Amino acid sequence: MIYLDNAATTLHKPPEVAEAVKNAILTAGNASRGAHGVSLSASRMVFETRSRLAKLFDCPRADHVVFTANSTEALNIAIYGLFSSGDHVISTDLEHNSVLRPLYDLQTRGVSVDFVPADRQGNIRYEDMETLFRPETKAVVCTHASI
């Protein structure tokens, strides 16, 4: 899964974003909410955006591209949808609550979670992570980069 979150860390939006939002508010309808022209136009725009993103990320199907309201919702959908009792997950002590809280909850449901500790500088040793892999490890859930 590839997750992109620009809104959380960008103070001011480029003028093009403001113009696109204004245009959407004034002219767009609700996608997939009707057979009238404005709704159909919005639906086409959403589908075209999904198609472009699928191509950009080499995703085989546009319907595999999902839009969510925010990072917490996206992470909850992914984490709760991926793991079940008997699975093993590796994460780190550095993760945001939107990762940690679902993982803690899943531990009460039979999912095993190991956390790689951070050193005093806030770094993890990948060698420590590698020692935690086992046959039932389903994923590593961790931040790749944070600025």
Question: What is the predicted function of each stretch?
Answer:
Residues 1-147:
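Pyridoxal 5′-phosphate
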